[in-house]
């Protein structure tokens, strides 16, 4: 807990403990606490964790005071015992930050008598016993029951540095406690006596006076102030009062006699004011390279008691003030981190003392007086010497040297202010000389008095002065601290010539965990083993921080030594003093007061550094530098961020602030301050970057964001891979590392594929990340065999994550530190591992992604990657962006920049009889399949593999939906893939099918996932060939029952992944059948906006497209031929269509379209009526020159009219009307669509439609003009009239215009009729070239949903409109009308028909007629296909390609053909999709 005020060697502690134990045991001595500020005693740590007790005896007359305290150094747990409330003991403690528990004793103990106190700890309970007559216990309410103890056991008070550092005390209020005044003895822990480790302002007393509270220093004649007069300082030595008169100008036992001869130190305090009684002061200024050297060889010192006095004034924190002696017989007095350090060794170990002020430091540029005394004493028959050091006469520390050697003998030199090599002086805690002023340096013993300052000024022949010393006090320039603000900032220092010996010291302060502080290396030399390639070796020296710990690294050619300088972390924002000293192969590294020795391996003692010494980091251009593998921060690009001050090299100060200015170093600031505000509080990291507080800066972890930059503000480049693409970083030189930081983001739909790997041209060394069965697999192989390691285990592997082939972004992080591995995926728990063997060096020439090209040493090659990579960072280098920006010239790649849709190795199965056979699918225990497909076919077998017994696997399309069928031995199972619509839409779809070892089956189509767990058998035992695209024709009959396929797959397959294997469907095929080609040409002609004229609907098919012209009034392959046209002349005429009585439809939705030209203001064009007595009707009419529709389906008359278009202008117009229940739409030409949504609940069924009347003669408003291309719910009545249909009757003045087109001569009619006669649901993606703007409403973003008639058979229970309120469920499924945005029904898009019952004979006739129609349709379609204009569109997809998302449906190249005048004015933005049933 904190920095101890006394530091001793282990031997000395043991001897001192034995000494004190003897004193305590034989004489019953105790510790006297005078109640002074700064008093304290520290005993060894009492492990009061669980069950333990300690006891002591106490004697006092004080009513208040801190008796005892210990804690966990600033976290949660503590225990405090104080005197309070009239001299009663109060105990408080806490565990795990719980509310402190407190008990107050009933018995006062401040009566001047001895009292026994015992404290018993039992987990959450603590009991206080007093004099065996009182016992009280208390329990703390904490979640944890064990108490944590880190500090020593403090008795009587706390050390000053702990009071000044509140963060190191768990109980902050303990700083304000009054010190204890009285005596304490017989301290025991678990019945065993314990001795104090160190103390301050506390005296050892054999037996306190019975009066209590007194001491020899308080005795004296009545009326006198005490034993020591004239300001003398009293201390108790061997139970006697001893007066220190050195600062008074008096002498004698009680400082009563004026001293006219002997110089004390008191007058020095007045020296600056000239009040020294006229005596000359001997002062000298030292600037770091000067020192005095007094030769003792002629008159060696031999003394048992001696005294050293001096005064100093400085701004420097560290520096040697005085030293004499060598080997194991010396005295060293120095300033260490602003405190006064004394080290004495008389042969049996060092006595060390460190005196610190209560507040601040001694390097405050004020005068301070130091006095060191040593006296030989015989105590209880044991010889020892008591050493006392005091600063300014107040801060005093007392201790003992060992009993074996009590004489200080020195025939060496007295060094003052420094030495030739301070770091090499025995026991020296610092390595640099003093910088400041020293005054009146005096050594005296019983025989000699050496006034060293006077001798130097007077030029005594035994005194040598090194350097130019000014014998007055001058200001010495301070070594200002500097701050390295960024990891890239650094300072270059001159070459360090430290071949045999050397020292470096500095102070640093930071909160950052990593950073290279110092680094230099020597000339490269080649070491060649007979078996292995040449290796470059260098001598080097480095000091670095890793994970908050400070490390020394040194190699003198015989092997590297790596020392952790301190067990605790040093990135807590406090100043730390580092002192490195070496002499040949051995030396020390010390941090503050803790010193760690080292011995370098091998025989070499020469450190040959040829390069500059870098401070704070390394230059960006590292071409000339050689980085040893052991210096991890250099290879990880961790520059130091924090403060540095007081840099001394070989005892010489370095003005690093001035060096930074001369070098114009960016990111170096000439000061050091710690900002109180935490930078991360302002959320500076954008795009969800993780923020960490650094040293006066924020550090953003952008690895999981897809962004780069200091604040994650710059979007990272994406690379797209299609299985044949790669990026390879070919490093300029071979790299050797022992630590790596790797991070990347990936997105893939495949369960297998290489993400990143380091590769070597000379070895099997690799660090590899890959996808393996949907998990991330890390492989590290250090090829120990090649370099002749002692032990080798082979590659280490770690796995992390599950189901990572979900086409989502995932982040992978790898951290290796020597043998330690850590793998993290996203924010999941990190997977850790420890590598076996002695070898830790990774060798690599390349960093590869997508494909491993360096395969010489690979036993198996990982699967190529298909997907996307982003933010690949290796040891701080963002290689993808560096390649893209041209910042490095050693990257090779053919992967595509940017996020692109990936279609890998596409293959076209041009016919349904085409297929390939591959080797058996290996899916015994688990399986991961992936492929992409594009088709316009509803059905087709995609994949089939049979096996032993009934085992098999099938993937097929059924009515546009994907089926996964399998049998593991327990019977066939079917899983239907989930999709919002049929998949035969001529778009690419992604399919992933997997089975894990627990029989969890997963089918993912694009983003929709279906899962199912099956019981029983877990293995899929496949034996025969794997068929892709179909099977032989005769095989379809023998496929398992749950398989629907009767023909093969027609379309494109791509990115086929069979359990990690990427087959070439053509090259790897055992045999092929039918027409199979590379690439994906798709349909030779594809639907475009203007494929069909006059708002015809384009129907995409694999071998082309057809146009549905039913709602256009036009005909022909492209809807640009006139429809069947009749002229109704003056006097009127009428065309009537009558449904057979047993075949009258009832519909929920109707579609009507017709073209016309007229000049009439009033007329009826078309009227549809229901059977007699029902009253349902629909009428298209002209009223006042405007077109309108009226209809009634059982509730009220509903009207809709286009009021803005005048249509009796003699020009040709097309009107389109749709109804869905009571809702309706009306459109004239390309005018906006009019919508009608009547209020209230409406009946929906147009019942039992009987007649269609064209011409309006019966209604008394005969039409006069031209009518063309009438379409109503699948009936082309004018075409049927021209063909003399038996159900058509023509009366009046009606004449057919032009040729008589057949109702089955166009592809549009064929499509419509086939749809009407079909009983299966058929959905096809279509493109409608029409304006969809709605009057009074913004245009909808949804496609117009358009279907052919949905034919439903009505039962006898639903004959009338009574069923409209709650209509019957149809016996065969139908497609529901989609609702538009806002929840309202759309304008009608489908004709829904309910037909009355018909006889069996009628059904047979209908089937025969349908078959005949199909044959005619096929013949005509083939004729038109052979003669149609082939110049529309052509698609040529390469074997491997990545398309832009805007062209993901085939990336076709469009060749426009001439359009009619009407189609040329179409709004090309009006593009929708329609679905046909």
Curated annotation (Swiss-Prot):
Record-linked Gene3D superfamilies: 2.60.120.200, Laminin
PROSITE patterns the UniProt entry points to: ASX_HYDROXYL, EGF_3, LAM_G_DOMAIN
UniProt KW Ribonucleoprotein keyword: no
Binding site for Ca(2+) 2: 765, 782, 841
Domain EGF-like, first and last residues per copy: 213-256, 676-713, 1083-1120
Molecular-function GO terms, alphabetical: acetylcholine receptor binding; calcium channel regulator activity; calcium ion binding; cell adhesion molecule binding; neuroligin family protein binding; signaling receptor activity
Stretches the record annotates as Interaction with CASK: 1444-1470
Cited InterPro entries: ConA-like_dom_sf (IPR013320), EGF-like_dom (IPR000742), EGF-type_Asp/Asn_hydroxyl_site (IPR000152), Laminin_G (IPR001791), Neurexin-like (IPR003585), Neurexin-related_CASP (IPR050372), Syndecan/Neurexin_dom (IPR027789)
Listed transmembrane segments: 1402-1422
Pfam family, one: Laminin_G_2
Noted disease: Pitt-Hopkins-like syndrome 2: A syndrome characterized by severe intellectual disability and variable additional symptoms, such as impaired speech development, autistic behavior, breathing anomalies and a broad mouth, resembling Pitt-Hopkins syndrome. Other features include decreased reflexes in the upper extremities, constipation, strabismus, and protruding tongue with drooling. In contrast to patients with Pitt-Hopkins syndrome, PTHSL2 patients present with normal or only mildly to moderately delayed motor milestones.
PANTHER family from the UniProt entry: PIKACHURIN-LIKE PROTEIN, SP2353, ISOFORM A
Protein name: Neurexin-1
């Amino acid at each position: 807990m904190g920095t101890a005020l006394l530091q001793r060697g282990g031997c000395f502690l043991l001897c001192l403990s034995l000494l004190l134990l003897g004193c305590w045991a034989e004489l019953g001595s105790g510790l006297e606490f005078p109640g002074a500020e700064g008093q304290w005693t520290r005993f060894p740590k009492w492990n009061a964790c669980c069950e333990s007790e300690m006891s002591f005896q106490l004697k006092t007359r004080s009513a208040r005071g801190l008796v005892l305290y210990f804690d966990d150094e600033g976290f949660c747990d503590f225990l405090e015992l104080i005197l309070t409330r009239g001299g009663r003991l109060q105990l408080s403690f806490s565990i795990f930050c719980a509310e402190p528990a407190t008990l107050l004793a009933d018995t006062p103990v401040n009566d001047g008598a001895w009292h026994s106190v015992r404290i018993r700890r039992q987990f959450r309970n603590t009991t206080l016993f007093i004099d065996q007559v009182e016992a009280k216990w208390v329990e703390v309410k904490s979640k944890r029951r064990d108490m944590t103890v880190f500090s020593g056991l403090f008795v009587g008070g706390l050390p000053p540095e702990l009071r000044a550092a509140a963060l190191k005390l768990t109980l902050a209020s303990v700083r304000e406690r009054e010190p204890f005044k009285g005596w304490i003895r017989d301290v025991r822990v678990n019945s065993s006596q314990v001795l104090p480790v160190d103390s301050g302002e506390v005296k050892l007393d054999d037996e306190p006076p019975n009066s209590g509270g007194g001491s020899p220093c308080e005795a004296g004649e009545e009326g006198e102030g005490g034993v020591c007069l004239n300001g003398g300082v009293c201390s108790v030595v061997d139970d006697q009062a001893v007066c220190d008169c050195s600062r008074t100008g008096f002498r004698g036992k009680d400082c009563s006699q004026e001293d006219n001869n002997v110089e004390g130190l008191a007058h020095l305090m007045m020296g600056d004011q000239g009040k020294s009684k006229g005596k000359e002061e001997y002062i000298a200024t030292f600037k770091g390279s000067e020192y005095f050297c007094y030769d003792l060889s002629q008159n060696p010192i031999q003394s048992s008691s001696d005294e050293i006095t001096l005064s100093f004034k400085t701004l420097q924190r560290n520096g040697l003030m005085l030293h004499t002696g060598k080997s194991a017989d010396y005295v060293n007095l120095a300033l260490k981190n602003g405190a006064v350090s004394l080290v004495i060794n008389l042969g049996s170990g060092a006595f060390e003392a460190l005196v610190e002020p209560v507040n601040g430091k001694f390097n405050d540029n004020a005068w301070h007086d130091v006095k060191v005394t040593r006296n030989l004493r015989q105590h209880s028959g044991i010889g020892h010497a008591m050493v006392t050091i005091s600063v300014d006469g107040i801060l005093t520390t007392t201790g003992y040297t060992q009993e074996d050697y009590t004489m200080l003998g020195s025939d060496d030199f007295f060094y003052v202010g420094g030495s030739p090599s301070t770091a090499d002086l025995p026991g020296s805690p610092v390595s640099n000389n003093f910088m400041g002023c020293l005054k009146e340096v005096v050594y005296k013993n019983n025989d000699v008095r050496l006034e060293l300052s006077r001798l130097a000024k007077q030029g005594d022949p035994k005194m040598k002065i090194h350097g130019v010393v000014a014998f007055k006090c001058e200001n010495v320039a301070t070594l200002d601290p500097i701050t390295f603000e960024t990891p890239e900032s650094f300072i270059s220092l001159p070459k360090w010539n430290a071949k045999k010996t050397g020292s470096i010291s500095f102070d640093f302060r930071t909160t950052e965990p990593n950073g290279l502080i110092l680094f230099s290396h020597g000339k490269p030399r080649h070491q060649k083993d007979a078996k292995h390639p040449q290796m470059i070796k260098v001598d080097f020296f480095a000091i670095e921080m890793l994970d908050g710990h400070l490390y020394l690294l040194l190699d003198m050619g015989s092997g590297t030594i790596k020392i952790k300088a301190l067990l605790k972390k040093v990135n807590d924002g406090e100043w730390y003093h580092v002192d490195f000293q070496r002499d040949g192969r051995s030396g020390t590294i010390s941090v503050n007061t803790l010193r760690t020795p080292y011995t370098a391996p091998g025989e070499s003692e020469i450190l040959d550094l040829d390069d500059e010494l870098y401070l704070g980091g390394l230059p960006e251009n590292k071409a000339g530098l050689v980085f040893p593998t052991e210096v991890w921060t250099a290879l990880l690009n961790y520059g130091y961020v924090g403060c540095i001050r007081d840099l001394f090299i070989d005892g010489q100060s370095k003005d690093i602030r001035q060096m930074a200015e001369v070098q114009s170093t960016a990111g170096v600031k000439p000061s050091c301050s710690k900002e109180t505000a935490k930078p991360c509080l302002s959320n500076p990291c954008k795009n969800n970057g993780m923020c960490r507080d650094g040293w006066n800066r924020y550090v953003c972890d952008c690895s999981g964001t897809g962004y780069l930059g200091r604040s994650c503000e710059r979007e990272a480049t994406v690379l797209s891979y299609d299985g044949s693409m790669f990026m390879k970083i070919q490093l300029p030189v071979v790299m050797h590392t022992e630590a790596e930081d790797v991070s990347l983001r990936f997105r893939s739909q495949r369960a297998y594929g290489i993400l990143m790997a380091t590769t070597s041209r000379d070895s099997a060394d690799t660090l590899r990340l890959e996808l393996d069965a949907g998990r991330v697999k890390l492989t590290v192989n250090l090829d120990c065999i090649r370099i002749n390691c002692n032990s080798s285990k082979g590659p280490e592997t770690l796995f992390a994550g599950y189901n990572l082939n979900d086409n989502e972004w995932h982040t992978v992080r790898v951290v290796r530190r020597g043998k330690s591995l850590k793998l993290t995926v996203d924010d999941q728990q990190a997977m850790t591992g420890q590598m076996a063997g002695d070898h830790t060096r990774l060798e690599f020439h390349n960093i590869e992604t997508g494909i491993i090209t360096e395969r010489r040493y690979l036993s198996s090659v990982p699967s190529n990657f298909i997907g996307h990579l982003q933010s690949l960072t290796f040891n701080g280098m963002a290689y993808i962006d560096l390649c893209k920006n041209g910042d490095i010239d050693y990257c090779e790649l053919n992967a595509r920049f940017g996020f692109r849709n990936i279609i890998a190795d596409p293959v076209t199965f041009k016919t349904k009889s085409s297929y390939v056979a591959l080797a058996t699918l290996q899916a015994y225990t688990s399986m991961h399949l992936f492929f992409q497909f594009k088709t316009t076919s509803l059905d087709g077998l995609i994949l089939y593999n049979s096996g032993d017994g009934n085992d098999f696997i099938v993937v097929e399309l059924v009515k546009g939906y994907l089926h996964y069928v399998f049998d593991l031995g327990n019977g066939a199972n079917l899983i239907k893939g989930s999709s919002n619509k049929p998949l035969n839409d001529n778009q690419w779809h992604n399919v992933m099918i997997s089975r894990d070892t627990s029989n969890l089956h997963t089918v993912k189509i694009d983003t929709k996932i279906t899962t199912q767990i099956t019981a029983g058998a877990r293995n899929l035992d496949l034996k025969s060939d794997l068929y892709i695209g179909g099977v032989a024709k005769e095989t379809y009959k023998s496929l398992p029952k749950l398989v629907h396929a009767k023909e093969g797959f027609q379309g494109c397959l791509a990115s086929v992944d069979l359990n990690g294997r990427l087959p070439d469907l053509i090259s790897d095929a055992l045999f092929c059948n039918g027409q199979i080609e590379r690439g994906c040409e798709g349909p030779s002609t594809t639907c475009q906006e203007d494929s069909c004229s006059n708002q015809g609907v384009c129907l995409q098919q694999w071998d082309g497209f057809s146009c549905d012209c039913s709602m256009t009034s036009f005909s022909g392959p492209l809807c640009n031929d006139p429809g069947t046209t009749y002229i109704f002349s003056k006097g009127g005429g009428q065309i009537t269509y009558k449904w057979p009585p047993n075949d009258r439809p009832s519909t929920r939705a109707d579609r009507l379209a017709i073209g016309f030209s007229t000049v009439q203001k009033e007329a009826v064009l078309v009227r549809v009526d229901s059977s007699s007595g029902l009253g349902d009707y629909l009428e298209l009419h002209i009223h006042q020159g405007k077109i309108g529709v009226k209809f009634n389906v059982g509730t009220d008359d509903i009207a809709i009219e286009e009021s803005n278009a005048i249509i009796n202008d003699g020009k040709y117009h097309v009107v389109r009307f749709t109804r869905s229940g009571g809702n309706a739409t009306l459109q004239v030409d390309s005018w906006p669509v009019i919508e009608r949504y009547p209020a209230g609940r409406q009946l929906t069924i147009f019942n039992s439609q009987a007649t269609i009347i064209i011409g309006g003669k019966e209604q008394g408003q005969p039409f006069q003009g031209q009518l063309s291309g009438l379409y109503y719910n699948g009936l082309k009545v004018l075409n049927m009239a021209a063909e003399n249909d038996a159900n058509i009757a023509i009366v009046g003045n009606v004449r057919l215009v032009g040729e008589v087109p057949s109702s089955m001569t166009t592809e549009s009619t064929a499509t419509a009729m086939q749809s009407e006669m079909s009983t299966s649901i058929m959905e096809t993606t279509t493109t409608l070239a029409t304006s969809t703007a709605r009057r009074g409403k913004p245009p909808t973003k949804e496609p117009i949903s358009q279907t052919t008639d949905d034919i439903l058979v009505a039962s006898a229970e639903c004959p009338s409109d009574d069923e409209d309120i709650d209509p019957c469920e149809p016996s065969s499924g139908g497609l529901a009308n989609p609702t538009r945005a806002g929840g309202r029904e759309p304008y009608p898009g489908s004709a829904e028909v309910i037909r009355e019952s018909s006889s069996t004979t009628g059904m047979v006739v209908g089937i025969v007629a349908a078959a005949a129609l199909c044959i005619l349709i096929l013949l005509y379609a083939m004729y038109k296909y052979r003669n149609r204009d082939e110049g529309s569109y052509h698609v040529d997809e390469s074997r491997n390609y990545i398309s832009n998302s805007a062209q993901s449906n085939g990336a076709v190249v469009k060749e426009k053909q001439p359009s009619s005048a009407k189609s040329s004015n179409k709004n090309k933005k009006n593009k929708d999709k329609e679905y046909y049933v």
